[in-house]
Amino acid sequence: MRFTATVLSRVATGLALGLSMATASLAETPVEALSETVARIEEQLGARVGLSLMETGTGWSWSHREDELFLMNSTVKVPVCGAILARWDAGRLSLSDALPVRKADLVPYAPVTETRVGGNMTLDELCLAAIDMSDNVAANILIGHLGGPEAVTQFFRSVGDPTSRLDRIEPKLNDFASGDERDTTSPAAMSETLRALLLGDVLSPEARGKLAEWMRHGGVTGALLRAEAEDAWLILDKSGSGSHTRNLVAVIQPEGGAPWIATMFISDTDAEFEVRNEALKDLGRAVVAVVRE
């Protein structure tokens, strides 16, 4: 469905309620509710939804379009900083290494780095800004320090991800064109990369802890999945968006339970950001219900 300017505000405010009521009436279990939510978002937004949900203790999983390609958008900032941490583990850099922030580096959405122009930021500060506040300039500086987008793609391959690839920097990596494989991942591939970085042995325990620290604050994700989670749960997440997309990747650690990995991608839709954002909230709500069960 294409949304006109006259109905967008109504859709944005009513979508979450409509989807929640529909899933509550049609679905009997949280998994069925999740499936219904995905189907209704695809229908109402004219979108593709890719989702992978995995319980790492038992290996139980549920997915939809798990092998299809979706733009990573800002979710790529997690593996970018994973690559920084891998080099830290190897002794090739220090997180206290400082890089300059130049006026020429500025691109749209730089809430942290725009206040540091003319100065330096450490790699630690840049990764926190890139992940927690989704600062695009911080991400570009980090990508450049690694050797460019191709170095990030090589890092994906080194952790066993044959699918994900980075071809451009911010903001061009968000440009959507149907069928374009640049700057894409799949829900399944990103789930495995998150597992490798945060739960596997790709990084040292110290590096895994640092990545978790950068991801735990929810600077730009507070109203998404983590808003539905229990207070005692640990949520490590990163969101992303473009003109036709809205994404979230997360590790969910329930109190006393095994970690879950959730990757959610909404794409190929002309709906405005507010509509896509409400749809992502609905996906997060449905995922949390499955985890809580």
UniProtKB/Swiss-Prot annotation:
Leader sequence segment:
1-27
Its recorded reaction(s) are: a beta-lactam + H2O = a substituted beta-amino acid
Q: What Gene Ontology molecular-function terms does this entry list?
A: beta-lactamase activity
**What are the catalytic residues?**
S74 (acyl-ester intermediate)
Which coarse location class applies to the principal site listed for this UniProt protein?
Answer: periplasm
Among the GO biological process terms of this entry, one is: response to antibiotic
GO cellular component, alphabetical, reads:
periplasmic space
Q: Which UniProt keywords apply?
A: Antibiotic resistance, Hydrolase, Periplasm, Signal
**Alphabetized InterPro entries for the sequence:** Beta-lactam/transpept-like, Beta-lactam_cat, Beta-lactam_class-A, Beta-lactam_class-A_AS
Question: One Pfam family for this entry, by name?
Answer: Beta-lactamase2
* Enzyme nomenclature, EC number: 3.5.2.6
Q: Which residues bind substrate?
A: K238, S239, G240
> What role does it play?
Hydrolyzes beta-lactams antibiotics. Rates of hydrolysis relative to benzylpenicillin =100: ampicillin = 27, carbenicillin = 25, cloxacillin = 0, cephaloridine = 4.
What family is this protein classified in? Belongs to the class-A beta-lactamase family.
Miscellaneous note of the record: The class A beta-lactamase family has a specific amino-acid numbering system, sometimes called Ambler or ABL numbering and often misspelt as Amber. A multiple sequence alignment was used to derive a consensus sequence and then the consensus was numbered taking into account insertions and deletions. This allows use of identical numbers, e.g. for active site residues, despite differences in protein length. UniProt always uses natural numbering of residues, hence there appear to be differences in numbering between this entry and some papers.
- The protein's name: Beta-lactamase
Originating species: Rhodobacter capsulatus (Rhodopseudomonas capsulata)
